[in-house]
Regions:
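Gram-positive cell-envelope targeting signals
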Residues: 1-36
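Solvent-exposed, well-ordered loop and adjacent helix/strand elements within mature globular domains
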Residues: 28-220
Length: 220
């Protein structure tokens, strides 16, 4: 009994101090990046404003959120799973974790962002961009103009996507990867009620067998 209690205490300490996520078994859906090429909307939505059409899509490692008592830390560590292939974090319905400005809701709110290529990105707000770092509306980052900032495990992401040897995944911008390239065309807030029938969106693009490498000088 003593050994079992000691084991449990050690596991709790590992979670709190190590800053990692291991709750895969609690999620109902696995994540496959190729599903985004032919995505099916499962939930009813309401269309909301597109605050800007910026194409830049940056990222942050989820370990940068360190305040254990914060809503975002608790959400990341209790509601999300790390995909050990791509490094994305996702929720039980396959929505990808992102940081958004205060313009777009609260931690845990979910959205469909449609790009001008037709790609639909199912996103869940797991972190919030600081108001002092965004425009007056809380929409986009003042320095890089990004609205979408993926919350990732940069170890796995760095192995899956290219980094040019500079340590930055996709030169710091997921817009450099063919699937995510494009401006924001439409934003819908996801409601809890599911659609009676899925709505299918198909992106007419041959899925590359190898990872495409796009080197855009500055990375944006």
């Amino acid at each position: 009994m003593f050994i079992m209690k000691k084991y449990i205490i050690c596991m709790i300490l590992l979670v709190l101090l190590g800053g990692f996520t291991f709750f895969e078994e609690n999620n109902n859906k696995s994540f496959n990046i190729d599903d985004l090429y032919d995505y099916q909307k499962e939930f009813k939505t309401e269309e909301i404003d597109v605050c800007a059409r910026a194409g830049a899509k940056t990222y942050m490692d989820y370990r940068m959120t360190t305040v254990v008592s914060s809503r975002q830390y608790q959400f990341i560590h209790n509601e999300l799973t790390v995909d050990k292939n791509t490094g994305f974090l996702y929720d039980k319905d396959g929505f990808i974790a992102v940081a958004l400005g205060s313009f777009y809701g609260e931690i845990g709110d979910r959205f469909y962002f449609t790009l001008d290529t037709g790609i639909v990105l199912p996103l869940v707000k797991a972190e919030e961009k600081a108001d002092q770092d965004t425009d007056a509306m809380g929409c986009y980052h003042l320095i890089d103009t990004s609205i979408i900032e993926f919350v990732i495990d940069d170890y796995y992401a760095g192995n899956y996507f290219w980094n040019n040897g500079n340590g930055l995944v996709l030169n710091g911008n997921y817009n450099n990867y063919s699937l995510f390239k494009g401006d924001i065309e439409k934003v819908e807030k996801v409601l809890e009620e599911r659609n009676d029938k899925y709505v299918t969106y198909t992106y007419n693009y041959d899925i590359p067998k190898d990872i495409d490498i796009f080197n855009y000088a500055s990375g944006y």
